[in-house]
């Protein structure tokens, strides 16, 4: 993609777009919430559908000229239903947070109670953090992982639910490396008459491929984003039983959003179609294997992992034991200098600030898309360890940067 048309009218933006393409090709994207979509998805997202207003739903729009918008949305919905086995799917949310908003608006009144996973223990802002709309509209209490194991404590969660009597329990995570037992959370919700929303934003692709247990058919609502492990472009999705369909649809539009982003929905349709190919199951399995290999190799280098490992696409490193004087922010910055891009992250029982926390979160979806296998992931883990163990050593940085450049050349993303 040369951006010739952009360069003709706006060379500054063209330079930025070209620079970003080179950055993605020439660095290792290890932020757990990022991935590389296909050229086909990008082409769909840059289509003429960006020009089309299509308020409403297929067959019931508030504008004319929506026949092809209807075709695209119907394809996206049908493919999502096939992927996840869901009764009802809404593909209009602009993001995972918008999907969560749709569920809240469909089911809760201001002041209702939500029980969700604490942000520093792996939750997400939209699950009720005070800085987020959910924390401002609803009464929120939060459960935590077990202090010893770093894993969800389902018995403690149930006891918390019994005491708090929430209207909704939110499950799911942004930085929890273990498989979630949805049925146990559903049982806690059933015991107090609460609804259960499972947010699978990070593991949408793993669930679709059978690499993580599915909450579809267990939880009342399943939300997610479409640009992390499933590679369908930026956006959100809501799945539910048919009984909730009308409430969800009206909460998304007109409740929370106006016109849907039809060009993004086209990207979702294409990405979901790609995920229906058997090769996607192989990809998802490799994502999980690569994360396990990455974690094990880092442990061999003396690093401590939250929960002791991973079952998913991400590894959460707690630096306090191995490198107590180094923050996650320090590591993030130094690794980016050598071409490894990840993010600082809070860890359970965080002792630093959220702006400069004690951990780093590392994901494997994007590198797996590029073709990285277990051997390559061991090399990446070695590079990460060398930089952290030798913070500030420019000779080490130069050597690691050369290794990263070789890996990028060996596994190109966008030709």
UniProtKB/Swiss-Prot annotation:
Q: Which cofactor does it need?
A: pyridoxal 5'-phosphate
Keyword Cytoplasm assigned: yes
Task: Please list the GO terms describing molecular function.
Answer: glycine hydroxymethyltransferase activity; pyridoxal phosphate binding
Query: Which reaction equation describes what this protein catalyses?
Result: (6R)-5,10-methylene-5,6,7,8-tetrahydrofolate + glycine + H2O = (6S)-5,6,7,8-tetrahydrofolate + L-serine
**Which parts of the sequence are marked as the site Plays an important role in substrate specificity?**
227
Q: In which pathway does it act?
A: One-carbon metabolism; tetrahydrofolate interconversion; Amino-acid biosynthesis; glycine biosynthesis; glycine from L-serine: step 1/1
Coiled coil segments of this chain:
none
PTM-bearing positions, type N6-(pyridoxal phosphate)lysine: 228
Q: Where does (6S)-5,6,7,8-tetrahydrofolate bind?
A: 119, 123-125, 353-355
Per UniProt, what is one Pfam family of this protein?
SHMT
Q: Which SUPFAM superfamilies match?
A: PLP-dependent transferases
Function field: Catalyzes the reversible interconversion of serine and glycine with tetrahydrofolate (THF) serving as the one-carbon carrier. Also exhibits THF-independent aldolase activity toward beta-hydroxyamino acids, producing glycine and aldehydes, via a retro-aldol mechanism.
| Homology family | Belongs to the SHMT family.
- Put simply, this protein is called Serine hydroxymethyltransferase
What is the source species?
Answer: Halobacterium salinarum (strain ATCC 700922 / JCM 11081 / NRC-1) (Halobacterium halobium)
